Regions:
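C-terminal accessory/tail domains of diverse enzymes
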Residues: 1, 5-186
Length: 186
């Protein structure tokens, strides 16, 4: 996850989308080594199979898959992604939610948006837009809740070693940091 400023979200999300190809190409584990077949990259395929709720009948083939790279660039804000996901996909899981986000805002507090976050976790975009709230301890002893936005690169493969995983993540974070400062538009 990379935390980004709300004003920079669309640009940084698009940058992460543009970096998927080169980062995945450098991070992908080969299923072949010295003529032997090893384990292959299965992260995306696993999620495709696990959360694809489409029927196999021909009348449903035009429905969007819950696992996808995405359809278009993000133009202005994270809201575009959330609106699209809410409009296209039914909820897969539910929970008891006791938060009324409007009431929370009216009280001057930060809403958790648990229903949105739960739904967002069931739509598997290769780069996920994330909203969260964290507790902040201030030097004067007070505490506050601070909302934040993150971009999560979900296509990085697992293993084969922890060092490989850290290196792959460092590559993505380094590219995001460097090009995020240099490029105004992807």
């Amino acid at each position: 996850h990379l935390q980004v400023a709300p004003k920079d979200f669309a640009r940084m999300y698009n940058l992460s989308q543009a970096l998927v190809g080169p980062v995945l190409a450098s991070a992908t584990n080969s299923p072949l080594l010295f003529g032997k077949r090893l384990w292959s990259e299965t992260r995306i395929a696993l999620f495709e199979q696990a959360v694809d709720t489409r029927k196999t009948g021909t009348h449903m083939r035009d429905a969007s898959a819950r696992v996808s790279f995405g359809q278009r660039w993000c133009e202005k804000s994270i809201l575009e992604i959330y609106k699209e996901d809410i409009a296209r996909f039914r909820s897969l899981v539910g929970t008891d939610l006791d938060e009324d986000a409007i009431d929370v805002l009216d009280r001057g507090q930060i809403p958790e948006l648990k229903a949105l976050r739960l739904h967002n976790g069931t739509v598997y975009r290769w780069n996920r837009a994330c909203y969260g709230v964290r507790d902040v301890d201030h030097a004067d002893g007070t505490k506050s809740r601070v909302p934040h936005l993150r971009v999560e690169m979900r296509v990085l493969p697992s293993g084969p070693t922890i060092l490989d995983e850290i290196s792959n993540t460092a590559l993505w974070l380094g590219l995001m940091s460097e090009y995020g400062e240099r490029l105004e538009d992807v």
